[in-house]
Amino acid sequence: LFKDVFDAKFYSQLCSDFPDDMKFERHDYDKENNLKQKKFILNENNIFFKEIINKKESLKKIYNFLCDQKFKEDIFDLLEKNSIRLQKHNTQGVLRKILNKIKNIKNFGFEFSMISTDGGFIRPHTDGSNKLISFVIPIVENKSIENVPNSGTNILKSTEDRYKYNFLNSTVPFESTEIVRKIPFNGNQIFFFIKTHNSLHSVGPMKNLDGETFMRKSINFFIYK
């Protein structure tokens, strides 16, 4: 968890430039468990994505910075200094790059996310097996969101043996988990975690304050294998 990451003026602009609700696609149905998560996303699969990124200078800057190979190398160097060594997959020749392009294999993922505070949640999961590292940048325009119960990210451990090795990212019932650490949803911070068989985490379920509904907005970024 890193605090006060951005220049205050840039972070304020980043919050202002966050895409409007109409551009988002509903991604709120958990088919496996027949539950509505009240989640909305906007990512590279949206036909408006590139246009949205390029129209706003702050979004363009953060996108280009995160998706640059140097950022990936810096993160790997930081992890290595802390005795965490991951396979870098960064020595790609021209042929490999062409094949990846043809197969639509991506090195990075970038998305805008919104979750309603009116009961919204993300069930406990470990992230897809194609991911190496996930980053979350909270977008906090209204400080009230920081006081919404369960608006942060909970780092969990499974209380049942059948969920303890979960590399393939099966969702886990909330009642089969125990909170190890709570990461608050505060402005101008970034936190990241490494995908493992037990990198279990969740959001919510959230509850409105004084009957007022907010959207928990974030920029999520992924480094893929």
Language-model segments: residues:
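Catalytic core of non-heme Fe(II) oxygenases with the double-stranded beta-helix
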Residues: 63-225
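Non-heme Fe(II)/2-oxoglutarate
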Residues: 1-84
